[in-house]
């Protein structure tokens, strides 16, 4: 039986790079989306 984990997604601007932060119960993952110079607008997260 699978247990449902709570996943929290945050979007931050880190050193000029849009970064998506996935926080789970035991760990967090950083996904670099692209630089703010090529993406001046805040990226939208579609759920």
Swiss-Prot record:
Keywords recorded for this protein, A-Z: Eukaryotic host gene expression shutoff by virus, Eukaryotic host transcription shutoff by virus, Host gene expression shutoff by virus, Host-virus interaction, Inhibition of eukaryotic host transcription initiation by virus
Function noted in UniProt: Inhibits host transcriptional machinery, by producing modifications to the phosphorylation state of the C-terminal domain (CTD) of RNA polymerase II. Inhibits phosphorylation at serine 2 in the heptapeptide repeat (YSPTSPS) of the CTD of RNA polymerase II, suggesting that the elongation step of transcription and/or 3'-end processing is prevented. Inhibition of host transcription machinery leads to shut off of host cell protein synthesis and inhibition of the host innate immune response. NSs also seems to be involved in the nuclear relocalization of host PABP1.
InterPro entries on file: Bunya_NSs
Signal sequence residues: none
Keyword Lipid biosynthesis: no
Official protein name in the record: Non-structural protein NS-S
Organism: Bunyavirus La Crosse (isolate Aedes triseriatus/United States/L74/1974)
Record GO biological process: symbiont-mediated suppression of host gene expression; viral process
Sequence similarity: Belongs to the orthobunyavirus NS-S protein family.
Transmembrane annotation, as ranges: none
């Amino acid at each position: 039986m699978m247990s449902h984990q709570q996943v929290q997604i945050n979007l931050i601007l880190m050193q000029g790079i849009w970064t998506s932060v996935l926080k789970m119960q035991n760990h967090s993952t950083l996904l670099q989306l692209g630089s703010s110079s090529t993406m001046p607008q805040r990226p939208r997260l579609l759920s």
